[in-house]
Amino acid sequence: MRQKHYLEAAARGLHDSCPGQARYLLWAYTSSHDDKSTFEETCPYCFQLLVLDNSRVRLKPKARLTPKIQKLLNREARNYTLSFKEAKMVKKFKDSKSVLLITCKTCNRTVKHHGKSRSFVSTLKSNPATPTSKLSLKTPERRTANPNHDMSGSKGKSPASVFRTPTSGQSVSTCSSKNTSKTKKHFSQLKMLLSQNESQKIPKVDFRNFLSSLKGGLLK
């Protein structure tokens, strides 16, 4: 395998300077092996590297879906019996393949590379290699606390310390209620202090004090 990659790299390097030597290297490797394996992007007849300058590429598409073929496919899907001629037409449509035609300009020969048929593609879609059920991630299940396990592990502890452990939501609610009660208490204390100061600054005015103030004003 390493020799094959090395010879292919050497042939590509000698393609512009010495194309004959490059073709000889590719031919020497293919002739020395029994499997008759050819290189990619290489003409199997003259061992010329198939590049844009010395090759012509064409694509022969698959057979098109005609209204008649569509009608036969619908009948087949409904489990209707088809005649021999109709079944042959449907089979030919399903087995049709796209063909890539590469013509070498050096030897003027064409190499065909066949694609996959419609039936093969449909089987791949219906039976994928990796099913979707395996790819779906499982959600982690919550573990429920076992009361027997808690009782066995909490020997020597009081029941209050075992079963009265507050959760995070309960602790947050208790802390918030304590804070609100403290603020209300401070507000009431401040209000009482302000009312006491106002009462000390303003003297009490009764009827006796009013008469004494009038008397003092008349004497003056």
Swiss-Prot record:
InterPro entries: DUF4674. The modification Phosphothreonine is found at T130, T139. Residues 119-136 have a biased composition (Polar residues). Keywords: Phosphoprotein. Residues 117-181 are annotated as: Disordered. The keyword Phosphoprotein applies. The modification Phosphoserine is found at S126. Coiled coil: none annotated. Residues 171-180 have a biased composition (Low complexity). It comes from the Eukaryota. Belongs to the UPF0711 family. This is UPF0711 protein C18orf21.
